[in-house]
Amino acid sequence: REATLRYYESCIALAAGLGCDRLVLDASGACWDRKDELLWRSAADTLYHLCPAAQAAGVRLLLAPVMGAETPLIAESPILNTAAELDAMLHQLNHPSLGVCLDTNIMSACGDTVYDWFGRFRDKIGLVRLCDGNYHGWRAWGEGVLPMQRYLHALDAMGYRGDISLRLPGERYLAQPAYPDERALAALCGEVGA
């Protein structure tokens, strides 16, 4: 546990040293053989210790959802999957340096919507990971099943003017690592011009 805290404290210090004002954290890699309550308590305790360090460094921690049991082939953690779970954690900790990162693929897999996220978090959303995908993971733009243009319109309708990142969708594109970004940027440029 202490090694984990030191690791994340180093990440916070590195982010601050690089001039980054945000650091995205998630619960991937959680132990599936432990009770959810224990995992929740451990995550809350870790964040409780990290939030003051992040605030002192001028870094905002963004809690990102992870794939859960609803996606068994790529499940990352049994907790902190849905918008409701992230909302409960934010309310439990109630710290100004803690926000969220919206990942459109995980959002969709959990049955949430952009409107759900903005209804819960609005000013707590510090980053949007705009990524296509399905229940088997992330895909290059247009190769998943998600309504990406609808997500863009929803973000615009909600007045989101913050940063958007494009997640590199894993090992399937190792032979062409630039391909997913090229697809996403082409789609985004087309959307902006429309």
Where are these regions (language model features)?
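Histidine-acidic metal/acid-base catalytic patches
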Residues: 20-21, 83-194
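Active-site acidic/histidine proton-transfer and metal-coordination neighborhood
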Residues: 1-99, 109
